[in-house]
């Protein structure tokens, strides 16, 4: 992909510095989620190779600069929860995913991982698996959809989904680089494909069990933004980045429990769908901002106002794959979540609805903490 913007990083110059001996020191890049559902990070030096998340030190940052704390009491603490090999610095360097905590020992109001983790721990015997399909759209540095004609539009949708060839796919180099970065880091990325709208792509992560699902999606998003940064391309997770006859972007959520995956599991899939039907509005609140622009009943979506389910129906709220219906066990797909979801909220409320509420966790109240 040719890039003309001088904002593009000069990685060919950087390379000779990346090859320098670090003299036993390790660089740990701490990553966290900010008040807008974006990602922030900063690096620190450690004096030895990290083998356990428990050995990672806590850190802090200025929460008043990220919308997570007032200026008069701005320290927010970073508590490491997972780490991954760093695909950019490589060697023994790592990327650390961290939760945000207030100085009074409470989780920051934008830290939804803490609440979701309680649900997964309570229902660990259910062995809940997820697979998330992250759709996104690429823009150039001037906020035009990448590869689209200046001041115009490409041909209508049709040839772009899983397309091959110039004029049908755009920025494949970005996508391939991201794919390799995830594999290197041990993210359970299971596939990629070009989507229905040109310059819209999707990657899938999973199956992952419990809280690890959202952890891995967040770190995969971080890698995507970092890769795109090097190519001078912007990543949008907006569920309807372009008005008109263009597909929106979602984060379809595939769900199963141990009982659903066993022979005869269709009964448990149907039970779960019945439970979901009774909490449709509660789920929708947690399924991403601006999702009403996407869930219109068009462009392979269900209507936001009604709950529906069906076999192989991509216009339903919940889709049962035809192969699952034939075999009588497996998983189901919730097609309602938008591309900009917080996966901790979505997987957490899914666990709460399917497996049961617990006394000390409530995902709806957890989401509402953001506005307090």
Swiss-Prot record:
PROSITE patterns: GLNA_1, GLNA_ATP, GS_BETA_GRASP, GS_CATALYTIC
Catalyzed chemical reaction(s): L-glutamate + NH4(+) + ATP = L-glutamine + ADP + phosphate + H(+)
Gene from which this protein is expressed: GLN1
Coiled-coil blocks: none
Identification of the protein by name: Glutamine synthetase
Pfam family, one: Gln-synt_N
Localisation: Cytoplasm
Residue ranges of every copy of the GS catalytic domain listed in the record: 112-372
InterPro entries, alphabetized: Gln_synt_N, Gln_synt_N_sf, Gln_synth/guanido_kin_cat_dom, Gln_synth_cat_dom, Gln_synth_gly_rich_site, Gln_synth_N_conserv_site, Glutamine_Synthetase
Gene Ontology molecular functions: ATP binding; glutamine synthetase activity
């Amino acid at each position: 992909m040719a890039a003309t913007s001088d904002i593009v990083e000069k990685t060919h110059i950087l390379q000779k510095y990346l090859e320098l001996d670090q003299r036993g020191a390790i660089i740990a890049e701490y990553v966290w989620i900010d008040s807008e559902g974006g990602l922030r990070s900063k690096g620190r030096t450690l004096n030895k190779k990290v083998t356990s998340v428990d050995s990672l030190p806590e850190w802090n940052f200025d929460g008043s600069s990220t919308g997570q704390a007032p200026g008069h009491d701005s320290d927010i603490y970073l508590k490491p929860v997972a780490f991954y090999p760093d695909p950019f610095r490589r060697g023994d360097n790592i990327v650390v995913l961290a939760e945000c905590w207030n100085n009074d020992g409470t989780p920051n109001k934008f830290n939804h991982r803490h609440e979701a983790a309680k649900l997964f721990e309570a229902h660990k015997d259910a062995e809940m698996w997820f697979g998330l399909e992250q759709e996104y759209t690429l823009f150039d540095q001037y906020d035009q959809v990448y590869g689209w004609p200046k001041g115009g539009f490409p041909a209508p949708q049709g040839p772009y989904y899983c397309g091959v060839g110039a004029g049908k796919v755009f920025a494949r180099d970005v996508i391939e680089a991201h794919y390799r970065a995830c594999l290197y880091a041990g993210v359970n990325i299971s596939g990629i494909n070009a989507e229905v709208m040109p310059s819209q792509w999707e990657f899938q992560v999973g199956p992952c069990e419990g809280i690890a699902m959202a952890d891995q999606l967040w770190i995969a998003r971080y890698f995507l933004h970092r890769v795109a940064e090097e190519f001078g391309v912007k990543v949008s997770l907006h569920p309807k980045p372009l008005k008109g006859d263009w597909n929106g972007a979602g984060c379809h959520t595939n769900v199963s429990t141990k009982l659903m995956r066993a022979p005869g599991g269709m009964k448990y899939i149907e039970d779960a769908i019945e439970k979901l039907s009774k909490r449709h509005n509660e789920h929708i609140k947690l399924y991403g901002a601006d999702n009403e622009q996407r869930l219109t009943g068009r462009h392979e979506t269900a209507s936001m106002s009604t709950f529906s389910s069906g076999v192989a129906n991509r216009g339903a709220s919940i889709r049962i794959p035809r192969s699952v219906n034939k075999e009588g066990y497996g998983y189901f797909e919730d097609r309602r979540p938008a591309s900009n979801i917080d996966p901790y909220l979505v997987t957490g409320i899914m666990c709460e609805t399917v497996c049961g509420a617990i006394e000390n966790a409530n995902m709806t109240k957890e989401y509402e903490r953001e506005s307090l």
